[in-house]
Amino acid sequence: MRIILLGPPGAGKGTQSERIVERYRVPQLSTGDMLRAAVAAETPVGLEAKAIMESGGLVSDAIVVGIVADRIEEADAKNGFILDGFPRTVEQAKALDAMLAQKGIALDAVVEFVVDETALVGRIAKRAEETAARGQPVRKDDTPEVFKTRLDAYRKQTAPLSDYYAGTGLLRKIDGMKPIDVVTGDVTALLEGFRETASS
């Protein structure tokens, strides 16, 4: 079970990812977590990343792909993994494809959560209101203004991945506007279909 999750911020990827991890016992690979772990473990790629970050630079796609390559070799990822938050660009997707091909690993699917952006902004605004009403501080990225900026960035940078993966035949779309449990049911049905195909 090797899958990539796509979708704009607020689409519910995090929630669905947690449920996939729980059901299928495969790790969710977050590039941020992997980067920190590689730096802490002082792996060759981690040391390279550390030097770049300490000088204020951005870690290159090659380094991130190297970190993903190391991580998927670990025992808990042998039966599969979920990539969430990577790749973010078509260039990263191509680099990831090349690395996986080198290892003889194939992705099972790229699952895109399709959502209504206007409704998403409304959902975020409501969440911010409810948080404030409880007297709790509202996260900076939970305000409609910041959220719209994040959506714009997603649209420009990451949305082209949908076309890229559609071209590979891996893309599967899920309606992310349905209730959470219904979305989970749709994701499970999709993934069970892949498991049956793999075992037949």
UniProtKB/Swiss-Prot annotation:
Keywords: ATP-binding, Cytoplasm, Kinase, Nucleotide biosynthesis, Nucleotide-binding, Transferase. Its main location: cytoplasm. PROSITE patterns: ADENYLATE_KINASE. Belongs to the adenylate kinase family. ATP binds at residues 10-15, 127, 178. Pfam families: ADK (PF00406). Catalyzes the reversible transfer of the terminal phosphate group between ATP and AMP. Plays an important role in cellular energy homeostasis and in adenine nucleotide metabolism. One of its GO terms (molecular function) is ATP binding. It catalyses: AMP + ATP = 2 ADP. This is Adenylate kinase. Residues 30-59 are annotated as: NMP. PANTHER family: NUCLEOTIDE KINASE. It is found in: Cytoplasm.
